[in-house]
């Protein structure tokens, strides 16, 4: 099985790649959900740091608890199943086996952080209660009688082996029709990508997609409801944010990573489809549903949006001044040359 994943910088069009690949008969698409368990806070990457790179008898156990908490959150609930629905109800089971394999031993006990991790009230109230017990010489009295402390200090080799076994088990369940290729959206980050390849025994290829900041800005201000994810107090702050998220992921020279622009998939479709196929190893004859998911004649409406919105003209000028190296050269392309299926649909989406 060969894994394909996309990474972006928020709203930069990486779904165009997942849409394109879902048109191939040899690809199992997973383009309805993002799987970030490797690089999200308290995910696998953080777990390795605390268990292997910066081991501490108390912090490492806490890291396992935090990872376990993330696993439970990702698995979902009865009314919002999240990961479980995609992993055939086995995500939690496979993850618990992974945690068990990383745990050397465990015992009933706790330390101050276990109190603080509950709430400020718990930290102070239970802390006082614990001191009273100590002064009274209360036998076997504990404010957290069911709390478990995990002890784990694997070698890096053991951690990587366990993690590769873990990710492979998850991917096998996810690829339920045993296709040669499988798309897993946002599996790896756009920064420090290379360090995460070692977590997989399967071959992994990554597309990192970027987009003209002027269009991203207009979409941030007008279309997207996730306004808590980006600054909107001033265009200057927004430009700082745009540059910030890219500077955290300087371009990485690795044969398993392909950088591309969203706009190139629209204006230079045939050229870039060929590049994508070559990069992954796809056979063009397997492209059996062209333009059903990625239709350049439709997706072109998601480009040059800033030219159709006059409300933010002054902001666009400021973006052109502050972020010149990220601008796409729209003057060099012609919409009349765009290929695809004819459509009457217009407007951004």
Where does each model-flagged region fall?
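PAPS-dependent sulfotransferase catalytic core
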Residues: 1-158, 295
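PAPS-dependent sulfotransferases, especially Golgi type II membrane carbohydrate sulfotransferases
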Residues: 1-4, 89-93, 98-102, 106-119, ...
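PAPS-dependent sulfotransferase catalytic domain
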Residues: 2-7, 12, 157-177, 187-195, ...
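A generic structural motif
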Residues: 25-27, 180-181, 201-204
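Low-complexity, flexible helical/coil segments
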Residues: 40-45, 63-71, 217-224, 241-250, ...
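Polar/charged alpha-helical tracts
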Residues: 49, 61, 65, 69, ...
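A polyampholytic, Gly/Pro-enriched intrinsically disordered region
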Residues: 49-60, 227-237, 305-314
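A short acidic/basic microdomain associated with nuclease active sites
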Residues: 182-186
């Amino acid at each position: 099985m060969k894994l394909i994943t996309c990474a972006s910088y928020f709203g930069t069009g990486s779904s165009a790649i997942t849409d394109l690949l879902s048109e191939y008969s040899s690809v199992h698409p997973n383009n309805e959900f993002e799987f970030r368990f490797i690089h999200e806070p308290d995910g696998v990457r953080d777990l390795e740091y605390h268990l292997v790179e910066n081991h501490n008898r108390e912090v490492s156990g806490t890291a396992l608890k935090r990872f376990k908490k993330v696993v439970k959150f990702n698995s979902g609930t009865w009314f919002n199943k999240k990961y479980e629905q995609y992993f055939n109800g086995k995500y939690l089971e496979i993850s618990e086996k992974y945690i068990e394999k990383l745990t050397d031993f465990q015992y009933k006990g706790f330390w101050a952080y276990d109190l603080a991790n509950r709430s400020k009230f718990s930290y102070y109230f239970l802390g006082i209660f614990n001191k009273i017990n100590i002064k009274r010489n209360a036998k076997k009295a504990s404010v957290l009688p069911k709390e478990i402390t995990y002890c784990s200090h694997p070698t890096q080799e053991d951690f990587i082996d366990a993690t590769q076994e873990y990710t492979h088990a998850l991917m096998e369940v996810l690829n339920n029709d045993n296709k040669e290729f499988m798309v897993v959206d946002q599996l790896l980050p756009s920064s420090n990508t290379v360090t995460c390849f070692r977590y997989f025994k399967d071959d992994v290829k990554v597309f990192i997609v970027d987009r003209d900041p002027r269009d991203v800005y207009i979409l941030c201000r007008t279309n997207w409801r996730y306004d808590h994810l980006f600054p909107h107090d001033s265009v200057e702050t927004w430009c700082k944010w745009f540059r910030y998220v890219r500077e955290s992921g300087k371009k990485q020279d690795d044969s398993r990573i392909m950088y591309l622009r969203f706009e190139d998939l629209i204006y230079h479709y045939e050229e870039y489809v060929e590049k994508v196929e070559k990069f992954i190893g796809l056979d063009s004859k397997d492209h059996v549903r062209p333009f059903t998911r990625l239709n350049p004649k439709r997706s072109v409406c998601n480009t040059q949006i800033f030219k159709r919105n006059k409300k933010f003209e002054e902001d666009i000028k400021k973006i052109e001044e502050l972020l010149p190296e990220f601008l796409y050269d729209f003057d060099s392309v012609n919409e009349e040359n765009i290929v695809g299926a004819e459509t009457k649909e217009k407007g951004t989406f």
